[in-house]
Design a protein with these regions (language model features):
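Charged, amphipathic alpha-helical segments and their flanking helix caps
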Residues: 1-23, 27-28, 42-133
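A short, hydrophobic beta-strand-centered structural micro-motif
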Residues: 33-44
């Protein structure tokens, strides 16, 4: 697999709930009563693993956005964690999710300025393959 876009689309499909792939997410949530799930392809990191083998790490971020109050934040943080954990050890497009990272869990600035929860989890998918001679 060498198509991070295909992986992002696979993650969005796995999420369901109207999740969509976006390359420059910026949303106006005025009037939005339900949550919005956005998948962003972040990048690919490649490095030698062993003789004649390469390790590729594909990184994809999932954003959960929702209008909310501060009282709603604990449950929304828990939901972001549940989403991330649901992908651990799971295969999407033939790649296995080996790591989830929540740094930060959400954006305090968005909460203060927009009354919007923006939580992000970064998924790392791993593949090891033989290099061409």
């Amino acid at each position: 697999m060498d198509d991070i876009i295909e992986l992002a689309e696979g993650v969005a499909e796995s999420l369901g709930e109207g999740a969509e792939v976006s390359f420059a997410p910026e949303f106006d949530l005025k009037g939005l009563k339900t949550k919005k799930l956005v998948v962003v392809p972040v990048g690919i990191e490649s490095k030698p693993n062993a003789r004649d083998y390469l390790e590729d790490r594909y990184k994809v971020q999932i954003g959960l956005l929702k209008k909310c109050t501060e009282d709603d934040v604990p449950e929304l943080v828990r939901e972001v964690v549940r989403i991330g954990r649901s992908f651990l050890q799971k295969y999407v497009c033939g790649l296995r999710c080996m790591k989830t990272e929540y740094v930060p869990h959400f954006s305090p600035e968005h909460l203060r300025e927009r009354r919007q929860f923006t939580g992000v989890v970064e998924l790392t998918f791993l593949t090891v393959h033989r290099t061409e001679p």
